[in-house]
């Protein structure tokens, strides 16, 4: 009985870590730049991402420093 309970707990722990990591880690090498602006609105800190996937990946991995898409193309 203890072994079964332990096994269930381990499986739940593994499932939690696997489900929590939904961030895209591999993006294509296509260069279709997008300009992002910090979610706080500081336009002087705009940043060009290689593509939409790069911006999405950054936002997923950096919850406290996210960017909103400002426009397609490089930031000027």
Curated annotation (Swiss-Prot):
GO terms for molecular function: calcium channel regulator activity; toxin activity. It is found in: Secreted. Coiled coil: none annotated. Disulfide bonds join 23-60, 27-53, 35-75. PROSITE patterns: KAZAL_2. One of its GO terms (cellular component) is extracellular region. Expressed by the salivary gland. It comes from the Eukaryota. Keywords: Calcium channel impairing toxin, Disulfide bond, Ion channel impairing toxin, Secreted, Signal, Toxin, Vasoactive, Vasodilator, Voltage-gated calcium channel impairing toxin. GO terms for biological process: vasodilation. Residues 22-76 form the Kazal-like domain. SMART domains: KAZAL (SM00280). Residues 1-21 form the signal peptide. Vasodilator protein that inhibits vasoconstriction of isolated rat femoral artery induced by phenylephrine. Since platelet aggregation and vasoconstriction are key hemostatic responses, particularly in small wounds, this protein likely participates in the antihemostatic responses during blood feeding. Blocks L-type calcium channels (Cav1/CACNA1) in left ventricular myocytes isolated from rat hearts. This is Vasotab-TY2. It comes from Tabanus yao.
């Amino acid at each position: 009985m203890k072994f079964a309970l332990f096994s269930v707990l381990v499986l739940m722990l593994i499932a939690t870590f696997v489900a929590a990591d939904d961030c895209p880690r591999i993006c294509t090498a296509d260069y279709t730049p997008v300009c992002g602006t910090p979610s706080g609105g500081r336009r002087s800190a705009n940043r060009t991402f290689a593509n939409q996937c790069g911006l999405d990946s950054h936002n997923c991995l950096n919850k406290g420093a996210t960017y909103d898409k400002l426009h397609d193309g490089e930031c000027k």
